[in-house]
Amino acid sequence: MQKVLIVGAGKRGTALLHILIKTAIIDIIAVVDKDPEAPGLKEAEQYGIAVSSDWKPYIQQKPDIVIHTTGDQAVFDELLQRKHEDTIVMPGKMAYIVFQLMEEKQHLIQMLKEQTYKYDRIFNSTHDGMIFIDINEEIILFNHMAEKMVGKKREEVIGRPIKEVIPSTKMPRILKTRVPEYNQKQLLGDHLQIVTTRLPIIDEGGRLLGALCVFKDITDAVELAEEVTNLKQVRTMLEAIIQSSDEAISVVDENGIGLLINKAYTKMTGLSEKEVIGKPANTDISEGESMHLKVLETRRPVRGVRMKVGPNEKEVIVNVAPVIVDGILKGSVGVIHDVSEIKMLTAELNRARQIIRTLEAKYTFDDIIGKSEQMLVALEQAKLGAKTPATILLRGESGTGKELFAHAIHNESDRKYNKFIRVNCAALSENLLESELFGYEDGAFSGAKRGGKKGLFEEANNGSIFLDEIGELTQNMQAKLLRVLQEKEIVRVGGTKAIPVNVRVIAATNVNIEKAMADGTFREDLYYRINRYPISIPPLRQRLEDIEALSVRLIQKINRDYGRNVKGLSQQALRALSAYHWPGNVRELENVLGRAMIFLNPHMEWIEKDHLPVFELEQKENDTDQGTGFDFPDIEGEKLSVAVEKFEAHLIQQTLEKHHFNRTKTAKALGVSIRNLYYKMDKYGLANEGMQ
């Protein structure tokens, strides 16, 4: 119990005395007031509480709480000085509010206990058997008389299909017809004749909640049948309260078996009632231990426990409390809070920093999806290149995953424990890019940070720097970058001192650098510096066999981001995606799937063709019919993988013939590396005769 000292026995002190006397957890050690006629002193004496005009002896008893009601600031200050470090000194007004709230809380809890006890008594004191099933035909409620007449204990049947417990039941028919059936004769088991009333339970919105069955021996007649139907209102009210909550709620019985969940729970976890009701309490947990089971074991509530739930591993905070009626454990109630909605600040931060990101590499080669020959070649090249210190040039169209490759190369290298920094060379002006890359000295320019600033090359020392869109650099920046690659040192803007740096450079471009060299917009010497280890990443249209695996991974990601539970694509939808030419590559595929899932009905689990955004699926066919001069191979009736290989082999052969078997020109025309061309020629057994 908490020891309390009241200083001041006027009206406020007396009012607090009245409240605290009724509280079982409070022990009032004394009431003190300088005025011997104070009303609170007389009342305290009536209750056998010590009274005094001096509080100092009692403060030495180290009370837990001292309530000051005199209004004298000097007394309050002296109390604060003399109190024990564990003693709390509260102004009387604050204490009055706090203890009033405590009293109100206790009153509400007592009312709730009395109501729950009353409902339980009503349900189990009736002479009629009562069974309630949910919309999945599983037993939710089973009273004492039902146990007696059916011959099975409640614990044996809760959560089981009604047909398994009572094979002759007609309750599932009520779920289909929603039509009540009154006073129906039925044989229960082998000999017991009963009269039963079956009722659909429907909420005010017209939604079917389940079915209630009330039955009795035929000798008892049906005088009390209508009274039992009042339980429908009780059940509907309790269900509606839970279902109206925006917080996810789950209820289990004393054995840890799921009894009830609401719509918010299903939306958050991605689990339906069928997957939870009647199942163990740890069914919904993907990471962590069941707090329901812990509460049932300890009979104590738990709060603020982090875990992951559902197939999408939603991160949540869980509060669980036991349901105890008259000392008997009935189950537990859990409230689940979603804490995963804070994620989209990264994009805003990137814009604020003008698309320059200084992040640790997030991806590995395991995150790169691809089983096509071209993708496997690119992956093998990247893994080999990661083990070398050479500068790597990633080439590929926008959206093919060049940044993903850069992350993976860094994580595979011996620099993985140091920084990985990404810079978009096209996002900044020349002056701003120079100061970001190389840093600047104090006073280098107007608005420069006092004391200067390190550049990204210095920040990435002993790590990796990813220069995206390197083909967009100006001639001046190209010259400065060349110096860094040659000399392995930088000079800050406004400075003269050379600062050595040890940085692995990974560059990327989606433009034709060779053409830029021919046009004089890209330095040849820089080209040879960055092109020591080129890797060509194929566009999506050249690896259509990867669309299914990519879609599975992207749908999983979007499920986590949007809180959905979509399982995948129908075959028609997959064929539609495979027929498209994907100018935006994997980025466009993610966009298409994301839009489809946003507008997908929350209860639907599969993306159909009709759900996909309208795009030019016939574009490839139209393009090829308008005089391209390409002779298509006969692929009618072939499987997709075989048709793609035939098409690819035919295209390579025709391109070789067009360029008189010059392998360099052929590779350039096809947009692949020489090594990749050799690989495919060997794979398809294409003739080498006449090649130069």
Curated annotation (Swiss-Prot):
One of its GO terms (cellular component) is plasma membrane. Residues 368-598 form the Sigma-54 factor interaction domain. ATP binds at residues 396-403, 460-469. InterPro entries: AAA+_ATPase, Homeodomain-like_sf, HTH_Fis, NAD(P)-bd_dom_sf, P-loop_NTPase, PAS, PAS-like_dom_sf, PAS_fold. Residues 663-682 bind DNA. Residues 115-185, 234-305 form the PAS domain. The keyword Transcription applies. It is found in: Cell membrane. Keywords: ATP-binding, Cell membrane, DNA-binding, Membrane, Nucleotide-binding, Repeat, Transcription, Transcription regulation, Transmembrane, Transmembrane helix, Two-component regulatory system. Pfam families: HTH_8, PAS, Sigma54_activat. The chain crosses the membrane at residues 13-33. GO terms for biological process: phosphorelay signal transduction system; positive regulation of DNA-templated transcription. It is a single-pass membrane protein. GO terms for molecular function: ATP binding; ATP hydrolysis activity; cis-regulatory region sequence-specific DNA binding; DNA-binding transcription activator activity. This is Putative sigma L-dependent transcriptional regulator YqiR. The gene is yqiR.
